[in-house]
């Protein structure tokens, strides 16, 4: 093959790859059995929110998949964390939204726009692995604060968007 022809083939290949990336405008993180790392997936969705990406949480669709506008930054984060994802085009995403909107299915889309500030009600001397919730949040790399009686008395709870309480805190 002549050098000129091989250069044309290389250029056409890169143009083809570039055109595919332009068409894939959404990144989907499935949460069903195809997901390799469910807990890190939550961390990626949380990180996307902290970076001010809007995330669609697709309830009862692929196990509660997360979808957001394509971002190389989030794609790289998925790869780094071992999180399964795939790319779809705008027309494919609209078809998914139509499927979810069907009243005969028990599915919905919740728009997540802000990363919540999270607190876990737990004694200060507990380590993350002593408690299932803090263990999961730590593994998923979702930041949280531990609050206990002193913080409740000092009225710091309004500083948080989400407070996790264990049921045994009230049932003994």
Region annotations inferred by a language model:
Residues 81-114:
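Short N-terminal or domain-adjacent regulatory/targeting segments
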Residues 9-19:
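Bacterial N-terminal signal peptides
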Residues 1-6:
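N-terminal secretory signal peptides that target proteins for export/translocation
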Residues 20-24:
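Sec/Tat signal peptide C-region and signal peptidase I cleavage site
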Residues 17-19, 53-60, 107-111:
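Short, flexible, solvent-exposed loop/turn segments with mixed acidic/basic and small polar residues
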Residues 40-79:
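N-terminal, post-signal-peptide region of Sec/Tat-exported proteins
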Residues 26-27, 32, 36, 69-76, ...:
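Helical hinge/lid and interdomain linker segments adjacent to catalytic or ligand-binding clefts
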